[in-house]
Amino acid sequence: GGMGLVAACDLALAGPASTFALTEVRLGLAAAMISVPLAARITSRDLSRALLTGERFDAEHARRIGLLTEAVEDLEAAVGDLVDAFRPCSPQGLAENKALLAAPILADLDARGEELAGVTARLFTTAEVAEGMTAFLERRPPSWATPDA
């Protein structure tokens, strides 16, 4: 999903209209593969809440929990400033630092990737996922959802 892509980025900016959510749990799924880069970015308590509730949150909250580098008002200007910050940087230095940052995530994916892919594959064969996907497509709550109190 989108949050996995954001978590895989070295730097991530978002504007005030941006929203984020890990909605897999509402479909009967787990955010298995993307949990690896997410765990490298988001505090464990905040990741637990996002994974277990599927709640939607804004860019400022995403910045506070570590998913974003910055939540900005003017995204285009902020990206321009970031590009300018790279101008004096050595390509070799950037490449080596990127490798250092990516190494733990890649090692975790190497160690657990097959297992996590298996979790996703298994879940896609279940009745709960079929119900979750059908409910989503029909724009209705899934059968397991309890009404608000």
Regions found by a protein language model. Name each.
Residues 54-61:
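Acidic, divalent-metal-coordinating active-site segment for phosphoryl/phosphodiester hydrolysis
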Residues 6, 62, 97, 136:
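Terminal peptide-recognition signature
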Residues 1-51, 64-65, 78-82:
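CoA-thioester-processing core
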Residues 50-52, 122-123:
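Short alpha-helical segment immediately N-terminal to, or the first helix within
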Residues 132-149:
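Short, basic/aromatic-enriched C-terminal tail that caps enzymatic domains
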Residues 13-18, 68-114, 122, 127, ...:
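C-terminal long alpha-helix characteristic of the crotonase
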Residues 35, 44-47, 91-98, 116-117, ...:
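A general structural signal for well-ordered alpha-helical segments in protein cores
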Residues 54, 127-131, 139:
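Short acidic-aromatic low-complexity motifs
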